[in-house]
Amino acid sequence: MANPEPSPLMSEFQHLMIQVRSGNSAEFAVKSNDILLRARSGEHKDSELEALVRMERALFGIGDEERIGTELRWCMDRFNSISPGSLNHGISILNMAAWHRNKGETMMALATHSNLSPSSGHPKQLLGLSRLEVGRMLASLDDLSTAMRHLWAARGFLSESEMVPEALAASLEWLDIALDEVNDIAPRMQERIQNAKPRNESGTTWIPANSQDVREVVEMLLPVLLADVSGTDRADLGLVLDAAEMLEEEGWIASLVEKAEDIQDPRLLELLQS
């Protein structure tokens, strides 16, 4: 079923946002306020558009700074009421969570992210971005095993959504944690995700990575990373080399050596030549 045509007022707002994203934001405050007033009442009344405009104005920093969080929460609650599980609802959750994190309220940010879930029908690309952020926050709290689960889920959602740069980031961040300890008998990541349960006690956890999961990630990363090995700080290629040495994968090392003439990272070159 085709999406309905946007209303003239919604089209006007969409055009305004295109201008803003092109760098023409000088009149955003005035024009968005005019659209907001029309969306609130009369023949143009549109609750979804009102929430969209208020969310963008809050993100733009229009109004009292103390009220930005209140505005973002109002928008999230409004989208939850009129279109739960929608793209706009998911974006409003991400914005609210980011606001909490920027305020240093990590636990509130994590709690907000929990409102994004497959069972609620949220788009996979938003689920992927959410899991990526949750994984990063958990890693910052040293809850590495749980962080690995979320990063693994993120790479799956992001890959399915063809968000290649974000999927690569999730894969590399997972690998960076996983290489702390790898063996052949640890549960696979998919099993860990499926069997995950709320913990009865607070604190950090650790479960080693399974070597097959490491191989899966590196085999996905290697051709992409080798396509361009330039740059003087290539920690990503360093992770691949670490994984190759840990798992005794001579083929991975050989692939890196073949690119030695193009590699510019002095530390990586030294390791390859040692």
Regions found by a protein language model. Name each.
Residues 7, 47-49, 84-88, 126, ...:
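Structural signature of alpha-solenoid helical repeat junctions
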Residues 19, 39, 59, 100, ...:
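Residue at a conserved register position within TPR or TPR-like alpha-solenoid repeats
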Residues 33-40, 73-81, 114-121, 152-160, ...:
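Amphipathic alpha-helical segments of tetratricopeptide repeats
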